């Protein structure tokens, strides 16, 4: 697969076109940002870990019945994926109160919910990704009702799979963010990544944070947390 021109660069990844119009190459960076880009830094080795963790989990999710954009891992940092049109919604699943949820509603972190919650935010940098509901999403023509229903179904399937998989590694899945895309024929697939950048992982016994919160909150040992997640999940 030949990497051609760069067609996009985001906070954590670059995307390149290929000779196949239906495929692109994603290259993961070590750059880290938080608080809507106000805090910036580098987490050494993060790109490679996020790439390999995402590919492993998406491969397993495909087997579990959740379609994804994953095609083939090229190298430790680069992966071939299906070219999709991203649905401009961030889908947040929460199993335990933490982060912005705890702050927004004035509750302590660590409250285990009776059932997972789902939130949507509108992917719009100028508006700082505001929270919206499914009625807003349909009214703004960000997605149809059928697409929203499909996205919700897949998001909860991902949650069930990740909770079980991570529990076997001694990790509690607190919350996480997903993004979905549409292929050329309109099929909804899981896109973006599943990694310590997009999930909150707590050690099941100690509660130690094993994710980007260590960067956000200046907790130290950021690289070590990413490496520990790779060790537990990937055996690396």
What role is predicted for each listed range?
Residues 72-77, 166-182:
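A short glycine-rich, hydrophobically flanked beta-strand micro-motif that places a catalytic Asp/Glu
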Residues 194-236:
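C-terminal helix-cap and adjacent tail motif
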Residues 2-121, 233:
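Active-site loop/lid in soluble adenylation, ligation, and acyl-transfer enzymes
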Residues 28-37, 117-145:
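Residues forming anionic-ligand binding surfaces in small-molecule and nucleic-acid pockets
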Residues 142-174:
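A long amphipathic alpha-helix within ATP-dependent nucleotide-binding catalytic cores
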């Amino acid at each position: 697969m030949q990497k051609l021109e760069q067609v996009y660069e985001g906070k954590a990844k670059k995307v390149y076109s290929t000779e196949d119009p239906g495929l692109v190459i994603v290259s993961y960076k070590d750059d880290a940002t938080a608080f809507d880009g106000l805090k910036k830094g580098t987490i050494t080795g993060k790109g490679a870990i996020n790439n390999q963790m995402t590919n492993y989990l998406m491969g397993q999710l495909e087997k579990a019945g959740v379609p994804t954009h994953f095609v083939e891992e090229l190298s430790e940092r680069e992966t071939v994926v299906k070219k999709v049109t991203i649905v401009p919604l961030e889908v947040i699943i929460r199993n335990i109160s933490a982060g912005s949820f705890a702050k927004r509603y004035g509750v302590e972190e660590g409250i285990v919910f009776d059932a997972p919650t789902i939130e949507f935010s509108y992917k719009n940098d100028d508006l700082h990704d505001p929270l919206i509901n499914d009625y807003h999403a349909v009214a703004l023509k960000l997605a149809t009702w059928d697409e929203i229903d499909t996205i919700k179904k897949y998001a909860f399937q991902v949650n069930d799979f990740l909770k079980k998989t991570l529990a076997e590694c001694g990790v509690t899945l607190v919350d996480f963010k997903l993004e979905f895309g549409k292929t050329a024929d309109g099929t909804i697939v899981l896109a973006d990544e599943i990694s310590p950048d997009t999930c909150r992982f707590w050690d099941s016994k100690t509660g130690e944070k094993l994710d980007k919160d260590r960067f956000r909150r200046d907790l130290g040992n950021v690289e070590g947390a990413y490496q520990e997640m790779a060790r537990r999940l990937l055996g690396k």
